[in-house]
From Swiss-Prot:
A lipid is attached at residues 328-329, 343 (S-palmitoyl cysteine). Residues 99-149 form the DHHC domain. Pfam families: DHHC (PF01529). One of its GO terms (cellular component) is Golgi apparatus. One of its GO terms (molecular function) is protein-cysteine S-palmitoyltransferase activity. GO terms for biological process: protein targeting to membrane. This is Palmitoyltransferase ZDHHC6. The active site is at 129 (s-palmitoyl cysteine intermediate). It is found in: Endoplasmic reticulum membrane. Its main location: endoplasmic reticulum. It is an enzyme of class 2 (transferase). It catalyses: L-cysteinyl-[protein] + hexadecanoyl-CoA = S-hexadecanoyl-L-cysteinyl-[protein] + CoA; L-cysteinyl-[protein] + octadecanoyl-CoA = S-octadecanoyl-L-cysteinyl-[protein] + CoA.
């Protein structure tokens, strides 16, 4: 009922537009091709419905399709859960432990992060997935992971059907010569008489579906193991990055701090139960979380504030000396810039001569930073940050002592 309520409720009708994106279109096409070809191959050529095994096989194929689509659409339409706009903690004094989101005009609750694609602060955000055209987060993590498990299992079943269909239909039709292999599609089969002949077109379609099924099994199966690692450690991909930076910060400044990740409850089973429950809904409200006994609700958010302050201290001021149109791979900026573009979904930003940028990290050919905006844009909560070619900027000579440490010294 979750998916039906998400679609039927008037306020959420706009969610249907998530289907009109290359990710869901490709995903649903692959599901449709593999499912339909497996069913057709079974009924027509391999395992007819007038046998017990054929009937059981047909029911299993239908069940795989239903379960895969159920979890896929729930992951898409139920969504990750969003922090309410202009949200504030119940206790006013807790504001000092939280980051403020200028776009949502509210504070970021623990474990939440702002998604550029969804344009909202997402509860326990792991990542924005293009295949569901939505974020993977608190409310849909179980659905998303179940989909990642069921899709490879269904594809393995379908792949076996494809292989056995081609084997049984081609076994008596293949002849091997010294230098060639011949397939006589007009030769009769001796096992059972199919509803229609297994033609070259049917062979090509089955072979194509087999490739899709095997590719999906490998690709989606790898994603499943990544998500299970996230769940069993109760640590999202973003939080793993924050923890890594925390250790680097402590080591770099020799602060002697002992950072403990707050959301790992010490038991894989306890971590697992935070996402998968008998009711189907995850534990918690997406705002407050069970934490390690030596931590509190704001242990991670305080660390994030420290890292944010550290990033500001290490930022370096640059002035734009060359125009840049924001292209992903700008050939006009040199071959090294073209071929060594950052492999990330983070945006590129347009540059105009005379603009000022505070760079926080970079590579040999690219830099990442925040553009200095005018007062009106700043009040409106506008923030422009992203990657740009290093050759388009030059370091300001009057850079302050606090900002003089270049990013080349320590890249993130």
């Amino acid at each position: 009922m979750n998916i039906l309520s998400a679609i039927i409720v008037f306020e959420n009708l706009h969610e249907v537009k998530r289907l009109f994106h290359w990710g869901p279109i490709i995903a649903l096409t692959v599901i449709g091709v593999c499912s339909s070809m497996a069913i057709l191959d079974s009924i027509i050529w391999y395992w007819p419905l007038d046998t017990t095994g054929g009937s059981i096989n047909f029911i299993m194929l239908i069940n795989w399709t239903v379960l895969i689509l159920y979890n896929y659409f729930n992951a898409m339409f139920v969504g990750p859960g969003y922090i309410p706009l202009e949200w504030k903690p119940e206790k006013q004094q807790d504001i000092m432990y939280l980051q403020f989101c200028r776009l949502c005009q509210g504070y970021k609750a623990p474990r939440s992060h702002h998604c550029r694609k969804c344009n909202r602060c997402v509860m326990k955000m792991d990542h924005h997935c293009p295949w569901i055209n939505n974020c993977c987060g608190h409310l849909n993590h179980a659905y998303f992971t179940s989909f990642l498990l069921l899709a490879p299992l269904g594809c393995i079943h379908a792949a076996l059907i494809f292989i056995m269909t081609m084997y049984t239909q081609l076994y008596d039709r293949i002849s091997f010569g010294w230098s060639s292999v011949k397939i006589d599609m007009s030769a009769a089969r001796h096992i059972h008489h199919p509803i229609m002949p297994f033609s070259i077109a049917a062979f090509a379609a089955t072979l194509f579906a087999l490739g899709l099924a095997l590719g999906t099994t490998i690709a989606v199966g790898m994603l499943f193991f990544i998500q299970m690692k996230v769940i069993l450690r109760n640590r999202t991909s973003i939080e793993a990055w924050i923890e890594e930076k925390a250790k680097d910060r402590i080591q770099y400044y020799q602060t002697g701090e002992d950072f403990i990740f707050p959301y790992d409850l010490g038991s894989r089973w306890e971590n697992f139960k935070q996402v998968f429950t008998w009711s189907g809904a995850p534990m918690g409200d997406g705002i407050e979380w069970p934490v390690h006994e030596k931590c509190d609700q704001y242990t991670l958010t305080i660390e994030q504030l420290k890292q944010k302050h550290d990033k500001r201290q290490r930022s370096v001021e640059y002035r734009v000396v060359e125009e840049y149109n924001g292209a992903c791979c700008p050939l006009g900026k040199g071959l090294n810039t073209f071929f060594r573009t950052p492999c990330t979904e983070e945006p590129r930003i347009k540059l105009t001569k005379g603009e000022t940028i505070f760079a926080t990290r970079g590579t040999k050919w690219w830099m990442y930073g925040d553009k200095v905006l005018n007062e009106e844009q700043a009040k409106a909560g506008v923030r422009i940050r992203g990657w740009f070619p290093r050759r388009c900027v030059e370091k300001c000579l009057y850079d302050s002592a606090n900002n003089s440490t270049s990013e080349e010294k320590k890249e993130q």
